[in-house]
Amino acid sequence: YFYLIRAYKDVPYVTIPSTDDTNEFVVPAEKFENILDSLIMDLEEVRTYAVNKYTNKKANTARFTRNGIDALLADLYLWDGDWDNCIAAVDRIVANRVEEYKEILEKEPNTTLVLFNNEYPLISNLSPGSGNLGNAYNEIFGRGNSFETLFELAFEGGSGSVENTFIRNYYADRRQSSTSIGSLKVEARVASNIGTSSNVVYKSAYDGRVYESMDKDG
């Protein structure tokens, strides 16, 4: 919805799932300001329940954490013209990163992280053990899952393939070894004769229809 209201301003705003034909499908457009306020309220409500930091480095950047929520809140507050709350959200991110930097520095004295202006921990642009530049770019955009990353779509490299296992497990055909379309988990109320224990519900990996191609024998 954040993308939609920035592109089109007022858009239909629905917060409940459509489970049958009794739902109203012709919904009038909601005002930009009302949707923005609703998004902010939802994020503020769940922020304190979000994970602060995972122990796994990849999960820490590929899953939404409190830092990720604060970053999104900062952007939302910018569009709302609420400068104080925007600054507060960014300050929380910086404070969190400073604490992480101190922890890393204790364990890895030769870390490539540096304090910019003695305040903001960032990745040094100098490659370790050499005077070559480009280390920061490679860490952020090449290797990925970097210290500076708040949230990114992580893809796993190996054996010549690049994929996102989580996305494949939930939204792709699990019969395939690589990411491809063809899987969707059915909501239990859609039909009583459709199995819900398996993620694979399409008859064919190349059939994009939903109900018609669901595996009713599951």
PLM regions with names:
Residues 1-61, 85:
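Aromatic-anchored glycine-rich loop motif in surface-exposed flexible loops
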